[in-house]
Amino acid sequence: MANKLVIVESPAKARTLNKILGRSYSVKASLGHVRDLPRASLGVDIGKGFIPKYVIPAGKKKIIAEIKKAASQASSIYLATDPDREGEAISWHLVQATKLDKDDTPMQRVVFHEITKDAVKEAFQNPRSIDMNLVNAQQARRILDRLVGYKLSPLLWRKVQRGLSAGRVQSVAVRMIVDREQEIQDFIPREYWIIEVELARSEEKEASFKARLFAVADGTKLDIGNEDEADRVTADLENAEYKVKAVVPKQLTRQPAPPFITSTLQQEAWQKLHFSARRTMAIAQQLYEGLPLGKEGSVGLITYMRTDSTHVAASAISEAREFIGKKYGTQFLPPKPRSFAKKAKWAQEAHEAIRPTEIYRQPEQLKPFLNPVQLKLYELIWRRMVASQMSAALYDTTNVEIKASNAGSEKQHRGYLFKASSSVAKFSGFMVVYTESRDEDERGESPASLPELRIGDKLVYMGTFPEQCFTQPPPRYTEATLIKALEQKGIGRPSTYAPTLSTIQERDYVNKASGKFQPTELGIIVSRILTEHFPRIVDPGFTAQMEEQLDEIAKGNYEWTAALQEFYPPFQDTLDKAWANLEKLDLTQTSEEICPNCSRPMVIKVGRFGKFLACSGYPDCKTTRPYAVKIGVSCPKCRGDLVKKISKKKKVFYGCSNFPECKFAINRKPIAQPCPNCSNLLVQYRGDWAKCVACQYKVKLAGQEEQQEGVAL
């Protein structure tokens, strides 16, 4: 009979632990937090040192009663919640809500970073008490977020419109997206020209290669700004003599990346699998907590997924090296194990990187047991871990400099300089298992090889290839690049990236267009108000400083109430000034539309889901209609106007204004120019390329045509 009680967060984790611990243990799930701040009020007594007033949600009372009953029959109690601040706080709240600390039953905290037999056994052999430093760091974060959210939101409701909200980290993320949009709209493209020449050692075209112009003969960089300049240079090059000036062979070594931490897993899952951060973390949690593997039962497949440490246990490194030697051969093993112990300066407690719990459990072996998305994420984690302990990849690179001279030229320069390069894989190393998304993007940038060239070799000119280009604005953030930017600025921690990205979309401050974040008008308005009246709240530097304070609280170096006391008075002072000085905004705009029911003019309003048309006779007439933004492109089916729309999932798409009579719709942004091959509709494809929806013809766009249309800023 079970006489030892173990409490965890989820039923899946409970099932996996039950299998490991055996019948003498009873494992119960709390289903997350059992106490929280109240939904209907601030729940913080500011005047009494920021004392939180926690409540037990109605749905948790039954769970608490069940845990108390199980605890009364147990000889000992183990709190086995997740190994981070949130997990520590859940354990503490469990104790407070159930009053387990008032009983004589021994109660201890156990911590493990993977749900395996060895890790769990070690944790139960080394129990400890609840770490109040970690609990207080979580409490401080929760109260900070509550103060900002509950104090700012009423202001936005009164001064802008009902239903708006602000958050400590989310508002910084929205500001970053809004600032990037402003950069894009302010950007003025500059014309420039790239000129390449095709050269060969002989008249045989098969052995030819291309070299790019980069300077005049004395090494001064050459900037060609218009077609006339390009034509003059091209004319010079047609009669020039080409000679090899320098040949620099070099061996390039590319080292594998460390195993995943939370942010890099989210970034690579977005780049390679197109998983959102939220989806990635949900799947990773399933892999961590355990999935049924046939006769094996429920098995934890990866280590804990919220971490900012690249450290890997020595036993896992040994297992990986043994596996690599057997499967790939000793040439794929570096002489010494690779160590990735360096952590971000703000890294939380002693975590491990995200890795498989058993290297020998290869992805193909799990195919019968995991669903497709679970298998894809597991394989990504498995390959990254294995590759991290493999030999470096080796490349033979050659950089060649070529001088073009024209003795008969009367130009003031004395020729031009060109460069060509090649990179040939000599040893694939870790890349037989895993390539980063950046490596995949770089493929094809260099020719596979150059002919054997020596200094002084004369080359045969075979043609000139001038290309008009335009400088590009900074790209909009994707989930991957926004997470990377937040991490680099020290904003948020492993547990906050996914919720932040989800929240800013759910509150309609940003939309996704072709996988890139674009602010809504509502997001721009709210961000501008916060930037003007609450500059510290939306300042990335200040937010990063607050995160560092939370880290110090977790280490026991800073009092949590002191951090709140330092933050709150200036925040309240700023809030009082905003209430006094911020005028109520009228977001209503006139339109040319007439109400179909009462013939009054219709006006443009901004709601939770973006712009819409409403009758100016409200409340007498409550007619509303969707507001469609024309993009200046005709529908290929009925020649109506194509308009920008937002789907129920908050994704941008483009449809016909004659809907429902015409149901044409497409996800990619249509381009005004017709297909040069068949005159059908072109849509944005990748980067500065467009693709025909009919014949699939691809064409390179000029200037800013490839940019998504922005919201007026």
PLM regions and their residue ranges:
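Core structural elements
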Residues: 141-151, 169, 199, 252-264, ...
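Short helix-coil junctions and helix-kink-helix linkers
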Residues: 264-276, 483-493
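C-terminal or mid-to-C-terminal helical accessory/interaction module adjacent to the motor/catalytic core
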Residues: 115-197, 249-250
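Conserved short loop/turn motifs at secondary-structure junctions
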Residues: 2, 82-84, 161-165, 249-258, ...
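Intrinsically disordered, low-complexity regulatory segments
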Residues: 1-142, 151, 221-225, 231, ...
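Metal- or metallocofactor-binding catalytic centers and their adjacent structured scaffolds
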Residues: 218, 222-258
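Basic, low-complexity terminal or inter-domain segments flanking catalytic cores
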Residues: 2-5, 16, 25, 97, ...
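Alpha-helical scaffold elements adjacent to nucleotide-binding pockets in ATP/GTP-utilizing enzyme cores
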Residues: 16-20, 66, 89-97, 119-123, ...
